[in-house]
């Protein structure tokens, strides 16, 4: 009888030890965030881009010469990734990508490979050998692109043999100006810096902060950061525009703050702004 009792206690002790051992190991076997496979969606998204990447700010640096047929740009896009991404989908039409990378919060960089998609709407992708981690980072893309001649994106037109540039972004043509997450659900701030040959005006949404002459004689215009807006609301015009300064419109029952008022017209047509 004593032997059977001892055997029963021994069996119970072994069983309890196994249970405790399993409980102890569960912490070691817990799947960590680094072990989660990174997002790599194979099929180009139809309709909206995936929800895993959210843009929050754009800093766009352009060189535009209305006399030429193309422009160059460098854009920094601040993003937040909901989880690690080995592939990021975005919009790009007619851009030749010179370089692409992601800069992480610690200053390290991840090189990306750009692939232009055959999907409708210019849906394209950035592939990373080392995934972009969860959290905040910045996409940095250098590119060149032709001016559009069909009143879409950054288009070129001539009047009296003088070339002008202007934008028409709505509804989905900001993706012709800059690689971007070109959907109205994304509202972000935009900071533009635009260089152009002397003699041209540059007009954007932001207030002009500084104007600098570069070593090659070009003029660089630096603009204040906009409030958060959709990409189709970004506006840009470059060329020999005439300027008429209308002063500052004071606050009234409709607007709560003063608003600077200026008008631009093609060269030689400033007088037509008298009644604007």
Regions found by a protein language model. Name each.
Residues 75-79, 128, 135-149, 190-198, ...:
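Short, hydrophobic/aromatic-enriched beta-strand segments in well-ordered soluble domains
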Residues 73, 170-172, 180-276:
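Hydrophobic helix-coil surface modules that form long, contiguous segments used
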Residues 9-21:
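Bacterial N-terminal signal peptides
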Residues 94-159, 216-217:
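A surface-exposed beta-strand-loop module
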Residues 23-72, 159, 163, 184:
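N-terminal, polar/Ser/Thr-rich
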């Amino acid at each position: 009888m004593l032997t059977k009792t001892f055997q029963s206690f021994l069996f119970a002790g072994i069983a309890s030890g196994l249970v405790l051992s399993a409980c102890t190991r569960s912490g070691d076997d817990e799947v960590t965030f680094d072990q989660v496979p990174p997002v790599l969606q194979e099929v180009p998204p139809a309709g909206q881009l995936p929800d895993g990447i959210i843009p929050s700010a754009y800093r766009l640096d352009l060189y535009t010469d209305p006399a030429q047929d193309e422009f160059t740009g460098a854009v920094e896009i601040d993003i937040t990734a909901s989880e690690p991404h080995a592939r990021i989908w975005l919009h790009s039409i007619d851009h030749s990508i010179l370089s692409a990378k992601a800069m992480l919060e610690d200053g390290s960089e991840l090189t990306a490979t750009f692939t232009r998609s055959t999907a409708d709407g210019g849906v394209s992708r950035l592939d990373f050998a080392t995934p972009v981690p969860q959290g905040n980072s910045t996409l940095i893309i250098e590119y060149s692109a032709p001016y559009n001649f069909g009143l879409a994106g950054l288009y070129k037109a001539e009047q009296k043999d003088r070339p002008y540039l202007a934008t028409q972004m709505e509804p989905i043509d900001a993706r012709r100006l800059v690689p971007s997450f070109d959907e109205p659900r994304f509202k972000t701030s935009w900071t533009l810096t635009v260089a152009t040959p002397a003699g041209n005006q540059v007009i954007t949404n932001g207030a002009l902060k500084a104007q600098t002459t570069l070593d090659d004689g070009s003029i660089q215009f630096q603009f204040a950061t906009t409030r958060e807006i959709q990409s189709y609301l970004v506006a840009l015009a470059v060329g020999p525009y005439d300027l008429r300064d209308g002063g500052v419109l004071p606050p009234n029952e409709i607007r709560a703050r003063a608003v600077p008022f200026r008008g631009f017209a093609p060269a030689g047509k400033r007088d037509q702004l008298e009644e604007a």
